[in-house]
Amino acid sequence: MSNKDIRVVVGMSGGVDSSVTAHVLKEQGYDVIGIFMKNWDDTDENGVCTATEDYNDVIEVCNQIGIPYYAVNFEKEYWDKVFTYFLDEYKKGRTPNPDVMCNKEIKFKAFLDHAMNLGADYVATGHYARIHRHEDGHVEMLRGVDNNKDQTYFLNQLSQQQLSKVMFPIGDIEKSEVRRIAEEQGLVTAKKKDSTGICFIGEKNFKTFLSQYLPAQPGDMITLDGKKMGKHSGLMYYTIGQRHGLGIGGDGDPWFVVGKNLKDNVLYVEQGFHHDALYSDYLIASDYSFVNPEDNDLDQGFECTAKFRYRQKDTKVFVKRENDHALRVTFAEPVRAITPGQAVVFYQGDVCLGGATIDDVFKNEGQLNYVV
């Protein structure tokens, strides 16, 4: 089968990465369709809907490339699967990662299903990751060539079935090369700045946004031995290891968030970047997913490396099944500021094995009060 007989539906955001993704596939001779996903009603404070601006860029790019385009609305699916999860996690005092859930439930489920209904053989996105297809048909996901842009951390929940239908055309090149291609082709998005922050918040103030959905409950900010250091403006606004926004003055080292007590609405703080309370030995994680589950013996356990947040250096770990629903991830050396609600993502070299959601954090066999 030649490329012209293979239909690839590209998820287009109106950014440079997805624009170049569509261009590269078109150049390679595939039957390419562009689809713009509207996942959130994101009218800004000035009454301007940024999604409309992005869709106009998609239209212009698709016309430049010479491919058909459509818009599809996933606002209900996004609210049900991503945003309610986001709010529920904050209610529990955790720090969620909505991008992981968006990839799992929207971009590579709702969008993938929609594309298959359009007769697609594959979907493609502008993620910085790579797919390795083996002769027997199974696939592996590898880090993107550009280390600064690698996005496998956010793709850790994707299954073998999902990834077998996915292409990441720009995963083999650097971001600077993506920009160069866009400029060379005269694409309207060539100089458009990258989107930052959580997809549905955009450039809005995080505190202001969150307070629209969850009422803030101010409370005491104390040290672990009970010394009152001030007031917090609501536990949901703070994450483990956070330094800024505490409002604690005085001499000496800066102060950091080391824990939360939901029952008493207390924020725990301690002084010093390397304070002992910020370090842990192992964690328990649930909702785990592996691209190739049969390759990992969870009963015996296995060694690999892991990331506990995006753009963090890999840490050597030992992964073993804790029970039917959870994994125990033991660190080769203590790790700072592990945060419940965030993803722990596993690697063997460049291969992303999968990931899980961090639940509880331990040191010396005792659970830390990161979130209690």
Swiss-Prot record:
EC number from the UniProt entry: 2.8.1.13
Residues noted as binding ATP in the record, renumbered to the chain: 11-18, 37, 126
Reaction catalysed by this enzyme: S-sulfanyl-L-cysteinyl-[protein] + uridine(34) in tRNA + AH2 + ATP = 2-thiouridine(34) in tRNA + L-cysteinyl-[protein] + A + AMP + diphosphate + H(+)
Entries under Pfam families matching the protein: tRNA_Me_trans, tRNA_Me_trans_C, tRNA_Me_trans_M
Cell compartments where the protein resides: Cytoplasm
Gene Ontology annotations for the cellular component aspect, listed alphabetically: cytoplasm
Span list, region Interaction with tRNA: 149-151, 309-310
Disulphides: 102-199
Annotated GO biological process: tRNA wobble position uridine thiolation
Gene3D superfamilies given in the database record: Adenine nucleotide alpha hydrolases-like domains (2.30.30.280), HUPs (3.40.50.620), Translation factors (2.40.30.10)
Primary localisation category: cytoplasm
Keywords, alphabetical: ATP-binding, Cytoplasm, Disulfide bond, Nucleotide-binding, RNA-binding, Transferase, tRNA processing, tRNA-binding
GO molecular function, one term: ATP binding
Residue numbers annotated as active site: 102, 199
InterPro entries found in the cross-reference section: MnmA-like, MnmA-like_C, MnmA-like_central, MnmA-like_central_sf, Rossmann-like_a/b/a_fold
Site positions per UniProt: Interaction with tRNA: 127, 342
Region annotation (Interaction with target base in tRNA) ranges: 97-99
NCBIfam families assigned: PRK00143.1 (NF001138), trmU (TIGR00420)
Family: Belongs to the MnmA/TRMU family.
Main function: Catalyzes the 2-thiolation of uridine at the wobble position (U34) of tRNA, leading to the formation of s(2)U34.
Protein name listed in UniProt: tRNA-specific 2-thiouridylase MnmA
